[in-house]
């Protein structure tokens, strides 16, 4: 509740996000959501005159969407992930984009939209490949095979 009451520096925003990450690692997903939701709202409202990439929005939105997906709030996760995807593209900030695409692929899979899921898995796979993220390449290959029987090469 108190997250939106002040003005924060970039480091303080990262610190609040890291607090949410502690809850994530402890598998306390609802506690993480309780931090990430007001933090994202704060970033969207208080820092609206700062470019979203500078305001840490893609990073916070990625974590928030991932947590929403974990607690099976797929519609909400898609809404947040699509918002983050758009910011990444509009502002040329691609650090979180491959992970955001993977979240979208997973959510659409769980909603039964195989076609959209396959398209997004391919997009995420190639971005992971471009940036040589071997760990996430292995994860996405396994996941696409398990969920969709999809071979990514």
Where are these regions (language model features)?
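Residue register of alpha-helical TPR repeats
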Residues: 14, 52-59, 99, 119, ...
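Short coil/turn linker motifs that delimit alpha-helical repeat modules in TPR/alpha-solenoid proteins
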Residues: 7-8, 52-53, 92-93, 113, ...
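Amphipathic alpha-helical segments of tetratricopeptide repeats
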Residues: 1-4, 37-48, 82-89, 123-133
């Amino acid at each position: 509740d108190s997250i939106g009451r002040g003005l924060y520096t970039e480091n303080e925003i990262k610190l609040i996000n890291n607090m949410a990450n502690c809850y994530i690692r402890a598998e306390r997903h609802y506690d993480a959501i309780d931090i990430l939701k007001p933090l994202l709202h704060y970033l969207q409202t208080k820092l609206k005159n700062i470019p979203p990439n500078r305001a840490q929005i893609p990073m916070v939105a990625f974590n928030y969407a991932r947590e929403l997906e974990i607690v099976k709030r797929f519609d909400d996760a898609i809404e947040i992930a699509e918002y983050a995807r758009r910011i990444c593209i509009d502002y040329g900030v691609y650090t979180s984009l491959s992970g955001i695409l993977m979240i979208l692929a997973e959510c659409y899979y769980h909603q039964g939209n195989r076609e959209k899921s396959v398209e997004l898995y391919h997009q995420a796979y190639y971005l992971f490949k471009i940036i040589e993220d071997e760990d996430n390449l292995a994860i996405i290959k396994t996941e696409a095979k398990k969920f969709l029987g999809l071979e990514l090469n």
